[in-house]
Amino acid sequence: MNQHSHKDYETVRIAVVRARWHADIVDQCVSAFEAEMADIGGDRFAVDVFDVPGAYEIPLHARTLAETGRYGAVLGTAFVVNGGIYRHEFVASAVIDGMMNVQLSTGVPVLSAVLTPHNYHDSAEHHRFFFEHFTVKGKEAARACVEILAAREKIAA
């Protein structure tokens, strides 16, 4: 009896780059993403998680990962809020633009769960809302990841 498991597919590695600001909220996205990828694909997908200090570091890290050739896609996730010192829209825009540039220059899909709310106050109500919202966004990102990988596979066939 053959005790070796043989798959008729290759495992696709997905990199997740998460910012550590508001880690408890951002981690909900990552957990939901991992769970949804497992639900959708079983062992077809392997998710590797990488931490960066803040959102601003995501594009460079995503590019470094994409250029290795080991990843079929990269997800960047962060929670960019108004800290009262500088305009958070500037940071969010720079991060999203950087992520777009990474996918266009490397050919590796880079998905975004980098969210910047219009208003965020460090209150129990806002924390609870975004804690739950990042769970939804993680599931959505997983479905988008599977869809874009399937679309690219179809193009390559």
From Swiss-Prot:
GO terms for molecular function: 6,7-dimethyl-8-ribityllumazine synthase activity. This is 6,7-dimethyl-8-ribityllumazine synthase 2. Keywords: Riboflavin biosynthesis, Transferase. Belongs to the DMRL synthase family. One of its GO terms (cellular component) is riboflavin synthase complex. (2S)-2-hydroxy-3-oxobutyl phosphate binds at H126. GO terms for biological process: riboflavin biosynthetic process. The active site is at R87. Pathway: Cofactor biosynthesis; riboflavin biosynthesis; riboflavin from 2-hydroxy-3-oxobutyl phosphate and 5-amino-6-(D-ribitylamino)uracil: step 1/2. The keyword Oxidoreductase does not apply. Catalyzes the formation of 6,7-dimethyl-8-ribityllumazine by condensation of 5-amino-6-(D-ribitylamino)uracil with 3,4-dihydroxy-2-butanone 4-phosphate. This is the penultimate step in the biosynthesis of riboflavin. It comes from the Bacteria. InterPro entries: LS, LS/RS, LS/RS_sf. Homodecamer, arranged as a dimer of pentamers. It catalyses: (2S)-2-hydroxy-3-oxobutyl phosphate + 5-amino-6-(D-ribitylamino)uracil = 6,7-dimethyl-8-(1-D-ribityl)lumazine + phosphate + 2 H2O + H(+). It comes from Mesorhizobium japonicum (strain LMG 29417 / CECT 9101 / MAFF 303099) (Mesorhizobium loti (strain MAFF 303099)). 5-amino-6-(D-ribitylamino)uracil binds at W21, A55, Y56, E57, F79, V80, V81, S112. Its EC number is 2.5.1.78.
